[in-house]
Amino acid sequence: MKHGKKSFMIIEAVLGILVILVLGFIIYKQNGHEPETIAVIIPDVDESEWSAFKYGLKMAAREYDADVVIISKDNMETANDEIEIMNQEIAKGADAVIVKPIANQDGQQKLKQLEKSVPVMVVGDTFPEEPSGLHTIEPDHYQMGADLAQKLLENYRGNLIGKKIGIYSQYATSEAVIKRKKGICDTLKGSGAEILWSVSKENDSKEKINLQTQRRVDIVMALDNASFVEAGEAAKDNDLYGAVLYGIGNSTEAVYYLDAGWAQCLVAPDEFDAGYESVAELIKKRRNFFYKMKDRQITYTVLTRENLFSEENQNLLFTISR
């Protein structure tokens, strides 16, 4: 009996030492001086709408002594393409991943599987299922749409009777766009406005959509940067036939169309903060085994020509123009 008890105590002591060694190795690895490598997978990263985001990545990488590798490929069209590239980067030694997902159910499940290998942060859009179980950094999409519609109501003194509205977006299935549209529609209830059409440039029918072929409206509301820039160019060329433009965007082109008078309002999310916080969260997780990553909600600013160059908006404009 004494022999059995002694053996048990020896085994217990050995297991305790092993646990200490494993934890010590993890802490050593995570607190070592070798910079972590974070792979950033964004299909359209060269577009200027990502300038502030990339600047945020750069500043956080400098502060946390990390390496950020940005991967963007034109042929990244499906969730499988995205997952394949992520696996390649992990095989090359990436310690964490930031990804703008091609949002569908299959991609969501595969990202969850991938997160078992390395920490993953989702930016730019979310998945339809809430909660997805993945960590995200994004603005309050519904409230952005609501505030955009509220600015429209303010400019028309709450009376939109007889006004016809067209809603334009890049992707029909984007969860961010769906939430923004709902915010607009809920806010405009009872205003007298009629939403004449709501179309997306890329949709399930593969039909080519453009603004010039839509029925004439008084107001165009663009729900993402690409749509806002396209609508701004159309307004400049008089292809909106007098319709005024309100929208959401975060690029130098979007700011230009507002400043030049081709748009009345631009809601701009703080993408610098999104980039910075993405890196910060992942580094905290890599360097502290017990750290629980958090979802982050970034701020946004309602810009008009009147407040565009105000002192309080200088930092936002600076990061957008980087």
Name each region found by the language model.
Residues 98-116, 120, 200-255:
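Hydrophobic alpha-helical
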Residues 10-25:
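Hydrophobic membrane-insertion alpha-helices, especially the h-region
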Residues 27-53, 70, 134-135, 163-173:
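Short beta-strand segments enriched in small/hydrophobic residues
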Residues 273-322:
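Hinge/cleft segment of the Venus flytrap/periplasmic-binding protein
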